[in-house]
Swiss-Prot record:
It catalyses: (4aS,6R)-4a-hydroxy-L-erythro-5,6,7,8-tetrahydrobiopterin = (6R)-L-erythro-6,7-dihydrobiopterin + H2O. One of its GO terms (molecular function) is 4-alpha-hydroxytetrahydrobiopterin dehydratase activity. Keywords: Lyase. Its EC number is 4.2.1.96. The keyword Membrane does not apply. GO terms for biological process: tetrahydrobiopterin biosynthetic process. Belongs to the pterin-4-alpha-carbinolamine dehydratase family. Gene3D superfamilies: Transcriptional coactivator/pterin dehydratase. The keyword Lyase applies. This is Putative pterin-4-alpha-carbinolamine dehydratase. It comes from the Bacteria. Pfam families: Pterin_4a.
Amino acid sequence: MYVLVNKNPCNSLFKLFLFIMNKWTEQNNRLIKQFQFKDFKEAFEFMKRVAVVADKMDHHPYWTNCYNKVYIELNTHSAGGVVTKKDFSLAEAIDTLAHESDN
């Protein structure tokens, strides 16, 4: 279930489309994505950059790391454990950081 603060359905559908295209999936009221990097160091550097952004947003992911892979789940505990606009915003920021890692 998605709980979007913005009531504009076109804007909500557009955001949903963007996340589908970036391969985020929704499962059990969570946005989920796995990232793969060249090696452990690159994966950990990515996690450090995400941690800074997440802390500034006061919205923190559930994540795991195994060697060069980072698995991330997002939902909003304060909204009852559902996906909200905060999750989409953090996912967008995470994708931006991942693309920066590609370059």
